[in-house]
């Protein structure tokens, strides 16, 4: 998978279908969110908005976890073979995938295989049978009796008692997860995003890679050289996002340093750089509007980097209309469907970049070569076969020029 435009959806917060309108316990759709609330977004709601995504130019959606779980974020899996009832049914998911494919939209789902809920069948058996449980080696138990209380006496994720960590070195655990992946591959999904793979044993990652032909992207916050291409096709490229922040928002680096750091990222992933996500943000970060401090021109420039550099641009739901939100949980607010509240300056800019990208193979798949730089400005070419695009980017506050590069006589477009 390369050359796609990815749109990330947090299912509980994207769109609530009519059938969820009367569900008890839901907060009002536009009210402020917190870490515990359930807002009612569901799979049918996503299906209802596929025309919106098609019009925007999206070619793939990445869904945060949809498996049965207890929390609103669903990173605490209870059953890997069921859709969470708050989102719908397996039939609803099949219909969503089928509808996406009819609109040439691929579907990537979140695979949370490092940890589970305490209500996952294997951990429940440990709670019931303690040392006698045949699943006791599926987790790392420090002492008995095992209890779901603080401090936990079992290995867990992030100190959370509700997320016991699987022993991913265990061959039975590995076989179970491989079977889960094959099951969802049979549901015609196109890709898998692996949550916190840096905690998963290499032997399990190897089995995951060998068991499927699905596109695999890993959640990697730093250097992913260990993982790509051995285990993953690409990563969520937080390193590139951080680099663009340093240049465009903090302005703490010049063009020379930017180029050096980009070259390191590109060398890390090689050709697989085209399979990595260039992200505006995610469910784990503050929204782009917030870290740009409401500076629309800077936000537009940030988007230009994401769309003009190698990699697959990822738009986090709502960023394209100027939604606001600090870090989790506030970056997970409900999608604003009242168009009178949209920031059309941002929306039209993002839509225009998507159209530019989708109409130019050099931007989708081409190599990149820097051809000049000066202070806070650089120029580069994207080349794919006979197709070429030359890009000039100025992230400073004043007009600049690069000796030997003129636009006179050339067809060009000012993006920001």
Short names for language-model regions:
Residues 121-189, 197-198:
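Active-site-adjacent "subsite" loops/lids of carbohydrate-active enzymes
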Residues 5-7, 61-63, 107-109, 192, ...:
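Hydrophobic faces of well-ordered beta-strands that scaffold small-molecule active sites
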Residues 2, 18, 23-26, 72-84, ...:
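Aromatic- and acidic-residue-enriched segments that line the glycan-binding/catalytic groove
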Residues 1-3, 17-39, 243, 259-400, ...:
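Loop/helix patches that line or flank the sugar-binding groove of alpha-linked glycan CAZymes
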Residues 9, 53, 63, 80, ...:
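Conserved, mostly hydrophobic/aromatic
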Residues 97-103, 115, 127, 179-182, ...:
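Active-site-proximal helices and loops of the catalytic beta/alpha 8
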Residues 31-44, 76-90, 159-174, 189-199, ...:
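The substrate-binding groove and active-site-proximal loops of carbohydrate-active enzymes
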Residues 1-106, 114-116, 121-125, 175:
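N-terminal structural segment of carbohydrate-active enzymes
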């Amino acid at each position: 998978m390369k050359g796609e435009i990815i749109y990330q959806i947090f299912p509980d917060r994207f769109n609530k279908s009519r059938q969820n309108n009367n569900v008890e316990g839901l907060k009002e759709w536009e009210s402020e969110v917190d870490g515990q609330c359930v807002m009612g977004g569901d799979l049918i709601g996503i299906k209802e908005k596929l025309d919106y995504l098609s019009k925007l130019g999206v070619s793939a959606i990445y869904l945060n976890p949809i498996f049965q779980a207890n929390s609103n974020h669903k990173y605490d899996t209870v059953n890997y073979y069921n859709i969470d009832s708050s989102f719908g049914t397996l039939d609803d998911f099949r219909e969503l995938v089928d509808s996406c494919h009819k609109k040439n939209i691929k579907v990537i789902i979140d695979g949370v295989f490092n940890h589970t809920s305490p209500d996952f069948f294997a951990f429940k058996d440990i709670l019931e049978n303690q040392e006698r449980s045949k699943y006791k080696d599926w987790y790392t138990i420090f002492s008995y009796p095992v209890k779901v209380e603080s401090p936990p006496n079992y290995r867990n994720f992030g100190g959370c008692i509700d997320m016991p960590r699987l022993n991913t070195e265990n061959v039975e655990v590995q076989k179970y997860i491989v079977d889960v992946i094959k099951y969802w591959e049979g549901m015609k999904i196109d890709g898998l995003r692996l949550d916190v793979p840096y905690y998963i044993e290499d032997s399990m990652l190897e089995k995951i890679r060998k068991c499927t032909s699905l596109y695999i992207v890993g959640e990697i916050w730093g250097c992913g050289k260990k993982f790509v291409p051995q285990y993953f096709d690409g990563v969520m490229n937080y390193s590139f996002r951080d680099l663009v922040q340093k240049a465009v928002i903090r302005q703490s680096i010049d063009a020379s340093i930017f180029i050096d750091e980009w070259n390191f990222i590109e060398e890390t992933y090689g050709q697989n750089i085209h399979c990595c996500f260039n992200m505006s943000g995610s469910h784990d970060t503050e929204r782009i509007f917030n870290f740009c401090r409401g500076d629309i021109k800077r936000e537009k420039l940030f988007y230009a980097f994401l769309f003009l550099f190698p990699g697959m641009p990822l738009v986090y739901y709502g960023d394209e209309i100027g939604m606001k939100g600090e870090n989790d949980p506030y970056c997970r607010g409900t999608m604003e469907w009242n168009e009178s509240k949209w920031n059309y300056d941002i929306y039209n800019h993002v839509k225009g970049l998507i159209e530019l990208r989708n109409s130019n193979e050099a931007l989708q798949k081409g190599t990149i070569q820097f051809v000049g730089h000066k202070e806070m400005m650089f120029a580069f070419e994207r080349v794919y076969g006979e197709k070429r695009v030359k890009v000039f980017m100025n992230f400073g506050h004043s007009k600049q020029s690069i000796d030997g590069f003129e636009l006179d006589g050339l067809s060009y477009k000012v993006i920001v």
